[in-house]
């Protein structure tokens, strides 16, 4: 067991270092930060649809009609919009981050060596997944500064449990997509094809609840449960939904399992 953990950590470090040394990965991170900052300002300060504009409009209506209305929960509304936007942006970024996990190895001819090594296939897959998930966490970590600025002026103080659950949901969402993308990457030596197929799969899992709404009976209900958007929305609303946690965990383990089986097939072919 100790050897297994040592192998996972070694692969994890190698994978993480490769991302920080990759110009493409760093360029993606820079673009992600730039776009996220733009949306942060837009969500708060847009003169027509920004949250602060909504607060001002609500105050004007109350003053004109003289009828009190429940005040707009600015931190909560901001968190919903911001984390929803970050998740939508991640939909385009995550397939690019996962596309080279195995496709690059296959392209360079090192995947055959990896497949015939004495290291367990699931160990390699787990180490690679942890590496890319950690890189994604470093990408979203600076966004906490935006949220801290917003929450610092909240009266009364905004409870920390809601943003914590929201970020847990974002990490689980990313890990699910990256795990499934890792499996797709193990099937081809084309990083571009891997990214396209992963994006198509994620898009399906993103909008499957819309498809389920038009499918009657148990099949529609089953499809609705597969939606990563619906389950992510539960967490960013501060709702601890065990079924959502189970779904994300299932996607993560499914991706690792299928990746291990894909490499095992290659190992069998080599033998």
Predicted regions and their residues:
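Long, hydrophobic alpha-helical segments
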Residues: 74, 78-104, 139
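Transmembrane helix boundary and interhelical loop/hinge segments in multi-pass membrane proteins
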Residues: 95-115, 129
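Hydrophobic/aromatic residues in alpha-helical transmembrane segments
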Residues: 94-98, 110, 146, 179-180, ...
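Terminal transmembrane helical anchor/hairpin motif
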Residues: 5, 43-76, 194-262, 266-270
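Aromatic- and glycine-rich beta-strand/loop motifs that create alpha-glucan
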Residues: 1-29
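Secretory targeting signals
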Residues: 38-41, 70-83, 126-189, 240, ...
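Hydrophobic alpha-helical transmembrane segments of multi-pass membrane transport/permease proteins
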Residues: 23-53, 88-93, 200-204
């Amino acid at each position: 067991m100790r050897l297994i953990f040592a192998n996972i950590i070694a692969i994890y470090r190698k994978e993480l270092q490769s991302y920080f040394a990759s110009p493409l990965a760093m360029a993606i991170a820079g673009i992600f930060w730039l776009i996220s900052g733009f949306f942060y300002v837009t969500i708060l300060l847009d003169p027509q649809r920004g949250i602060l504009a909504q607060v001002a409009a609500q105050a004007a209506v109350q003053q004109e009609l003289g009828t009190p209305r429940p005040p707009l929960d600015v931190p909560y509304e901001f968190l919903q919009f911001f984390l929803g936007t970050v998740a939508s942006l991640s939909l385009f970024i995550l397939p690019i981050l996962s596309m080279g996990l195995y496709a690059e190895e296959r392209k360079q001819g090192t995947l055959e060596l990896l497949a015939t090594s004495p290291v367990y296939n699931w160990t390699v897959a787990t180490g690679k997944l942890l590496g890319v998930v950690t890189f994604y966490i470093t990408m979203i970590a600076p966004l906490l500064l935006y949220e801290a600025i917003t929450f610092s002026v909240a009266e009364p103080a905004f409870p920390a449990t809601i943003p914590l659950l929201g970020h847990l949901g974002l990490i689980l969402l990313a890990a699910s997509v990256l795990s499934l993308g890792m499996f797709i990457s193990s099937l081809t030596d084309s990083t571009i094809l891997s990214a396209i197929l992963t994006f198509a799969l994620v898009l399906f899992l993103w909008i499957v609840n819309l498809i389920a709404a038009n499918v009657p009976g148990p099949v529609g209900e089953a499809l609705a449960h597969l939606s990563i958007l619906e389950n992510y929305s539960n967490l960013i609303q501060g709702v601890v939904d065990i079924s959502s946690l189970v779904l994300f965990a299932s996607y993560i383990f499914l991706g690792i399992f299928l990746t291990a089986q894909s490499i095992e097939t290659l190992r069998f072919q080599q033998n």
